[in-house]
Regions:
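Structured loop/turn residues at beta-strand edges in well-structured enzyme cores
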Residues: 3, 78, 98
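A conserved short coil-to-beta-strand element within the FAD-binding core of flavoproteins
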Residues: 77-87
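Core beta-strand elements of the Rossmann-like FAD/NAD(P) dinucleotide-binding domain
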Residues: 93-102
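Conserved small/polar residues in nucleotide/adenosyl-binding loops
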Residues: 108-110
Length: 110
């Protein structure tokens, strides 16, 4: 991770959050340091209902640690508890605060 780059936090553990991490690394390279804040250790992808009606489809599990490592991002497994936009900080469920230059919220449940 580039300590001198802009600090970008992506909060969420779903497909959109993962796509944001991958796209930012590809587009910005080492000009950004990336943190993925996710409540779980795995990305779970379920088949769309049109492909597998009544949730009979299979789930696919992908380890977020490996995805993050592949693009030199930091994975923090914790819940997002709060955002202070004025101070540009987030608070995690553990109480830890982290600063950011840019924040992407990709939350499934509110």
């Amino acid at each position: 991770m580039s300590p001198s780059g802009a600090r970008v936090i992506i909060a969420g553990g779903g497909p959109a959050a993962v796509e944001a991490v991958l796209a930012l690394r590809e587009l910005a390279g080492d000009r950004v340091s990336l943190e993925l804040i996710a409540p779980n250790r795995e990305l779970v992808v379920r088949a769309y209902e049109v492909l597998a009606p009544f949730h009979e489809g299979h789930e696919h599990h992908y380890p977020l640690a490996q995805i993050a490592a592949d693009v030199d991002a930091e994975l923090v497994v914790d819940a997002l508890a709060g955002v202070d936009a004025d101070a540009q900080t987030i608070t995690l469920g553990s109480g830890e605060r982290r600063g950011y230059d840019a924040l992407i919220l990709s939350l499934i449940h509110i």
